């Protein structure tokens, strides 16, 4: 069995794989709670990807489970990494592209990862990872309007889209954040289709189902794309 751990800005996500088959997933704000959900498994290999520093105590907990490998932007993958500043590339972005490569090998694809940040990652049909873009995610947009102004309240995220015309401050903030992000995603997809008419679009990340609902179109969503990508890389090296 393989254990895949993805340390994000907000939560830690984990997946258990038997070869290439995903057997179980979990997510938690603490490593202890996450690992407790995998107690019944014995692991041969562990792959870790992180965008945050992992405390030594947490690493000790992981190492008790098995031999660990860290995934970084310089790790060998089936993709050719053409990013200009490889050392600054977030491991989650490359891992998501590797996950999409399992689905679209031989075709161009754009991964839209809707999490704390909204990340766009493009790979051409030759398997060259070229990069993309990063912008604030939905919760970050809502929080920023509160933290960078004196009087705007903090409006919590919910799954219901705001009306086009907000008739009070809270609904106006929701409209700007929610419909603004939705319009951004629609616009970026259109630009990529102009750049490459054959590009495949795949969504992942915690807010992906929310975007799918707002786009009202037949889009492909895989919430476990990063975990699958990391597992494929681990198997690639075994």
Regions found by a protein language model. Name each.
Residues 1-11, 15, 21-109, 126-238:
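Nucleotide/phosphate-binding catalytic cleft detector across ATP-hydrolyzing
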Residues 112:
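Catalytic metal- and UDP-sugar-binding loop of GT-A-like glycosyltransferases, i.e.
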């Amino acid at each position: 069995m393989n254990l895949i751990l993805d340390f994000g800005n907000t939560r830690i996500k984990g997946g258990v794989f038997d070869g290439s088959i995903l057997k179980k997933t979990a997510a938690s704000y603490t490593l202890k709670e996450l690992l407790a959900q995998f107690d019944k498994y014995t692991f041969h290999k562990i792959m870790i990807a992180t965008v945050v520093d992992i405390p030594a105590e947490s690493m000790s907990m992981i190492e008790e489970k098995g031999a660990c490998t860290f995934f970084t932007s310089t790790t060998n993958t089936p993709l050719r990494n053409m990013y200009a500043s490889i050392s600054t590339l977030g491991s989650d972005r490359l891992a998501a592209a590797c996950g999409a490569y399992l689905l679209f090998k031989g075709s161009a694809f754009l991964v839209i990862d809707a999490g704390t940040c909204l990340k766009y990652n493009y790979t051409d049909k030759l398997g060259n990872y070229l990069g993309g873009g990063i912008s604030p995610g939905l919760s970050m947009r809502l929080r920023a309007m509160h933290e960078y102004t004196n009087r705007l309240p903090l409006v919590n995220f919910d799954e219901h889209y705001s009306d086009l015309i907000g008739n009070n401050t809270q609904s106006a903030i929701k409209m700007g954040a929610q419909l603004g992000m939705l319009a951004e995603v629609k616009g970026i997809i259109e630009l990529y289709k102009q750049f490459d008419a054959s590009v495949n679009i795949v969504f992942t990340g915690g807010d992906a189902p929310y975007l799918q609902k707002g786009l009202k179109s037949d889009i492909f969503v895989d919430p476990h794309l990063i975990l699958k990508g990391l597992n494929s890389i681990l198997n690639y090296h075994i």
